[in-house]
């Protein structure tokens, strides 16, 4: 669990039923695993991130999308790392993105395919509250 690796974990789930079931599981584990209490969750459209708590040192996206959401890049801290599956619905590559901010405020992104082109993976598609897939926005 990420909660054992970080003081704060923020999780966004768009599927309400899945989020409610997960919340029940967390609550059932709190007595035995108090570190899970540092997980803050919300039901929302993850495309827009969680600006109230930004910037984030790390962002992990767990659904496939054909581009990197600009909102998530804005919420990534300087020298922060994002791991995100990017590509068409037929298969994505998992990118590791490091956000560098220079003294003058200019931003550069260092991108690396963590499998170096050797693997594509199909993730569940990134969806919006309207039900559209992110590539249809």
Language-model features: where?
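Conserved nucleotide-cofactor-binding alpha/beta core module
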Residues: 1-102
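Active-site capping/gating segments
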Residues: 87-137
């Amino acid at each position: 669990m990420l909660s054992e690796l970080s003081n704060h974990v923020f999780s966004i789930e768009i599927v309400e039923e899945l989020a409610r079931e997960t919340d029940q599981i967390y609550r059932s584990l709190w007595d035995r695993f108090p570190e899970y209490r540092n997980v803050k969750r919300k039901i929302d459209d993850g495309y827009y991130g969680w600006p109230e708590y930004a910037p984030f040192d790390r962002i992990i996206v767990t659904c496939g999308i054909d581009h990197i959401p600009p909102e998530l890049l804005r919420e990534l801290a300087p020298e922060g790392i994002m791991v995100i599956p990017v590509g068409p619905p037929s298969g994505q590559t998992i990118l590791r993105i490091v956000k560098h901010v220079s003294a003058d405020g200019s931003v550069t992104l260092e991108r690396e395919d963590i499998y170096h082109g050797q693997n594509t993976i199909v993730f569940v598609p990134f969806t919006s509250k309207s039900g559209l897939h992110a590539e249809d926005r």
